[in-house]
């Protein structure tokens, strides 16, 4: 069972965070809130999203699992105005999600969860390098790198005390170095990995709105981005596998 009301802007921000990686997901409702954890079809990236019940204007739920078509939900979101209260209700018998706002009442058929990949396990990998940066600065750097290449290196140079982002194309090159004066915080541990900008560009659109994003790095390891949404009552984690660097 689910019966909840949420601000349209918060709902949109949450759906956009998921849509950056996948077109469908298993959404779990509990007494504490909503959550999902899913990987993209290529097994390259993962998202974990949690919305505390305090995010909602009203919230009642029992343990439920829903198969959500993210594309359909985004289409419905396009009809919502800024700040509209959105009512969500799970019709258990018909397996439909009722979405109501303004004078509209949508009844969206849920996907069969048996056709959606099971939730992946939580990552346990050690990523000792830590950087905290504003979402706007991170997004801008990703955009800048995408002008010259389809991949970007993220790293930490502990001797210089900097976090750097570097991209190299066939003829062009860009490097951005950020020290303590440009970062919120830095744990200066040697780290460097190469990543696909195709994924990062989509993630960056969501992260651009975050006051701060924590980046966790290793050497030729995945990168983890964690940040809050909904005034700290919602939490997002992206995990992106590295690209193999050519010799």
Curated annotation (Swiss-Prot):
GO biological process: leading strand elongation; regulation of DNA replication
InterPro entries reported for this sequence: DNA_clamp_sf (IPR046938), Pr_cel_nuc_antig (IPR000730), Pr_cel_nuc_antig_C (IPR022649), Pr_cel_nuc_antig_N (IPR022648)
Subunit-structure text: Homotrimer. The subunits circularize to form a toroid; DNA passes through its center. Replication factor C (RFC) is required to load the toroid on the DNA.
Single annotated GO MF: DNA binding
Protein family (similarity comment): Belongs to the PCNA family.
UniProt keyword Cell wall biogenesis/degradation present: no
Name the UniProt record assigns to this protein: DNA polymerase sliding clamp
CDD domains: PCNA
Domain of life: Archaea
Keyword DNA-binding in annotation: yes
Keywords assigned: DNA replication, DNA-binding
Role: Sliding clamp subunit that acts as a moving platform for DNA processing. Responsible for tethering the catalytic subunit of DNA polymerase and other proteins to DNA during high-speed replication.
């Amino acid at each position: 069972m689910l019966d909840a009301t949420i601000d349209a802007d918060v709902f949109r921000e949450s759906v956009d965070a998921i849509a950056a990686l996948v077109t469908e997901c298993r959404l779990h409702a509990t007494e504490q809130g909503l959550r999902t954890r899913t990987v993209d079809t290529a097994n390259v990236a993962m998202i974990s999203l949690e919305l505390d019940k305090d995010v909602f204007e009203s919230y009642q739920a029992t343990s439920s699992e829903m198969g959500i078509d993210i594309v359909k939900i985004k289409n419905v979101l396009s009809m919502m105005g800024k700040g509209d209260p959105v009512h969500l209700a799970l019709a258990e018998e018909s397996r439909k999600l009722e979405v109501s706002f303004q004078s509209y009442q949508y009844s969206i058929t849920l996907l069969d969860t048996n056709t959606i990949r099971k939730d992946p396990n939580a990552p346990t990998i050690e990523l000792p390098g830590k950087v905290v940066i504003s979402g706007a600065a991170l997004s801008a750097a990703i955009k800048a790198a995408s002008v010259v290449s389809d991949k970007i290196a993220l790293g930490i140079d502990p001797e210089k005390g900097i976090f750097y982002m570097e991209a190299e194309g066939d003829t062009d090159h860009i490097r951005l170095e950020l020290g303590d004066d440009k970062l919120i915080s830095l744990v200066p541990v040697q780290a460097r990995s190469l990543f696909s900008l195709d994924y990062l560009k989509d993630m960056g659109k969501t992260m651009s709105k975050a006051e701060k994003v924590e980046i966790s790095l290793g050497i030729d390891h995945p990168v983890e981005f964690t940040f809050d949404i909904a005034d700290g009552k919602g939490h997002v984690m992206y995990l992106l596998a590295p690209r193999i660097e050519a010799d």
